[in-house]
């Protein structure tokens, strides 16, 4: 008896294309995205029946609404990460620099784009397509010596299983990763070397509870909401400087820079307040302090609670 071929993760790929009209899959513009993993899928509950029929046997269940969502882990790289930033913030403001360099600035805007995602299992000619996809959350963690990645939570509208890809000639991008060891950080506008780690969480406030009658259980639309920006800074406990900012509610700022040759990624939090969180004595080793924070927009000239500046050789996104 012959054994059917099984899809292999190494042979699979994730292709993303931005939609001109929400939920409408384009036929061109696909970009093959480098990823570590993707749990994007559609799930549908079966609801138990409460019908009484004169027998102890259960009646057939009914099908519920369909949730297309999941978490994607991409590397933080020189070219590809710009597409994730575009999904989060929309098209950047791009300017040409010296030589072949281009600077792309991503900020919080009035709306978010949508995209079609395709998980292609080419060894079994099956293509799992999700339309009307928006980014729900982004999480980044800096510090340590592990591979630098992001966690991207997405929410979509419709899943379609196809035998051919929506774009037969997607763009293949060069993969050049940023690394933790290339990071520098400023706190309050001053470069510091006592910070162990920085976590950043961005919640885009999506409303996925939009199941209209007549759409076969799929979402009809995904509305955007107010963005939440928070995180935690972990530093050596050397003095009271950080803790005093939390105690007094003093506004501060953070700026993290990653470099790779002539390429760079700068993340700015122009306005933030630390949450009061005193250190403790956990043992005989050095004492650290963890400072949760919330970023916001008040009166900074950038007019964005968080912004990303990506410099690379790509002309536009």
Residue ranges, per PLM feature:
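Signature of extracytoplasmic/envelope-associated structural regions
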Residues: 1-317
């Amino acid at each position: 008896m012959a054994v059917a071929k099984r899809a292999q993760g190494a042979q699979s790929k994730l292709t993303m294309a931005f939609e001109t009209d929400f939920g409408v899959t384009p036929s061109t513009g696909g970009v093959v995205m480098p990823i570590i993993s993707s749990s994007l899928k559609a799930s549908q509950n079966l609801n138990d029946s409460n019908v009484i029929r004169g027998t102890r046997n259960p009646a057939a269940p009914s099908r519920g609404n369909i949730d297309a969502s999941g978490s994607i882990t991409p590397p933080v790289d020189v070219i590809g990460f710009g597409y994730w930033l575009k999904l989060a913030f929309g098209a950047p403001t791009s300017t040409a620099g010296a030589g072949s360099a281009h600077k792309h600035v991503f900020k919080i805007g009035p709306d978010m784009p949508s995209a079609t995602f395709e998980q292609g299992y080419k060894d079994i000619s099956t293509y799992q397509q999700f339309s009307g996809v928006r980014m729900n959350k982004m999480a980044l963690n800096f510090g340590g010596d592990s591979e630098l990645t992001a966690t991207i939570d997405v929410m979509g509208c419709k899943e379609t299983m196809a035998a051919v890809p929506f774009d037969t000639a997607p763009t293949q991008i060069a993969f050049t990763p940023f690394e933790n060891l290339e990071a520098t950080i400023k706190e309050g506008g001053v470069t510091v070397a006592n910070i162990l780690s920085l976590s950043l969480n961005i919640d885009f406030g999506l409303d996925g509870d939009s199941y209209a009658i007549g759409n076969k259980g799929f979402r009809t639309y995904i509305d955007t909401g107010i963005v939440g920006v928070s995180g935690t800074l972990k530093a050596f406990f050397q003095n009271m400087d950080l803790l005093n900012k939390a105690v007094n509610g003093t506004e501060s700022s953070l700026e993290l820079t990653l470099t790779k040759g002539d390429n760079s990624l700068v993340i700015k939090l122009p306005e933030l307040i630390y949450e009061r969180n005193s250190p403790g004595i956990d043992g005989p080793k050095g004492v650290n302090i963890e400072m949760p924070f919330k970023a916001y927009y008040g009166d900074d000239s950038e007019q964005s609670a968080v912004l990303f500046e990506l410099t690379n050789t790509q002309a536009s996104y």
